[in-house]
From Swiss-Prot:
One of its GO terms (biological process) is translation. Belongs to the eukaryotic ribosomal protein eS4 family. Keywords: Ribonucleoprotein, Ribosomal protein, RNA-binding, rRNA-binding. PANTHER family: 30S/40S RIBOSOMAL PROTEIN S4, SMALL RIBOSOMAL SUBUNIT PROTEIN ES4, Y ISOFORM 1. Coiled coil: none annotated. It holds the Pfam family KOW. The keyword DNA-binding does not apply. This is Small ribosomal subunit protein eS4, Y isoform 1. Residues 42-104 form the S4 RNA-binding domain. GO terms for molecular function: RNA binding; rRNA binding; structural constituent of ribosome. GO terms for cellular component: cytosolic small ribosomal subunit. The gene is RPS4Y1. Gene3D superfamilies: 2.30.30.30, 2.40.50.740, RNA-binding S4 domain.
Amino acid sequence: MARGPKKHLKRVAAPKHWMLDKLTGVFAPRPSTGPHKLRECLPLIVFLRNRLKYALTGDEVKKICMQRFIKIDGKVRVDVTYPAGFMDVISIEKTGEHFRLVYDTKGRFAVHRITVEEAKYKLCKVRKITVGVKGIPHLVTHDARTIRYPDPVIKVNDTVQIDLGTGKIINFIKFDTGNLCMVIGGANLGRVGVITNRERHPGSFDVVHVKDANGNSFATRLSNIFVIGNGNKPWISLPRGKGIRLTVAAERDKRLATKQSSG
């Protein structure tokens, strides 16, 4: 009989987007409990060791973290298995680098470098708005932040811009047709496009139709949509490819063209 929480994670059972090879060991780092779900996060150790290649082993990552060099959303994190997730800002003071975790079109977290100015804020999706004790209204975001006394105009599914220094809302984007969004779940994960319309299905899942910059349309559930810009102007910088997914044939042609130009 299992008593208590699970403490291990086998490599084969780890999320695909961590891109860990099967043969280098049996286990994978199990993310600590935190603001993002196990299958939607990237542990700090995977980011530093496997993506940035700043360390060769888990031991080295621990030494980096214990020197308090790594900040996530402006807070020092010493836990190597801390679950960083979508929209989180990872700052390395020593090298003066800042990264934002956003998805590429293959549905993996891209190593996306950002400027110092952009590292001062993040976007959060509003998951829930409730009235707490003594009638205090508050909203809960996708990364488990609770913010009291929000603007009454802000509703569920809107996006709020948060100042990481103070934790306060500095701006917000309504969930509306014509606004730019990124897909954060499902088969279209990582695609960016403009919301064209929303189908309401009471008792089931609402469906949102999105059109990308190439004119391709696709549909996904409302829960998978994260608004990232007013009109077609994004509030964050996007990774290479700008969230436009190519077809298999287009991708092959592009690869051959680069091969010929370099060869």
